Amino acid sequence: MKEIKIEELTFNPFDLLKDWALVTSKNQDEFNSMTISWGGFGSLWNKYTATMYIRPQRYTKKLLDNNDYYTISFFDKEYKKELSYLGTISGNDDKNKMSNTKLTPVIEEEIVYYKEAKLVFIFKKEYVNQLTKDGIIDKKVIEQNYQNKDYSYEYIGKIEKVLIKEK
């Protein structure tokens, strides 16, 4: 992987998110990844940022809440099976779920990403807030996505680095 400037990126963010991604966070003893598909890229407080949404019961949320840094990794379509698995199996249920994929973790001091990723964003957490029933204008969203009232948490991270797979 090589580091590039964010201004060098040329992609459609909607296409990128359509193919899912993995958010990964760690603590001193472990790391965990989960699939995400809700989010977006933008700017906040004069910083380049990305937003993602995670339900409160997800194991990765516990790690995110205790670490200021995390990564979001994007993959070629050939890794869809791994992303599907990591989105289905919770770290709450299987602490060894990461070893059941063919992904190779690259573990650095504050972060973890994957050797197989085509694009990795490294983030510093800037803002966290839980969505609320009252804040959701279209009530069909609640019926379709939050029958259990497990409203997602919104995470906004400042993009610290961008890594791209070398060809």
How should each PLM-predicted stretch be described?
Residues 1-167:
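Active-site-proximal mixed secondary-structure blocks
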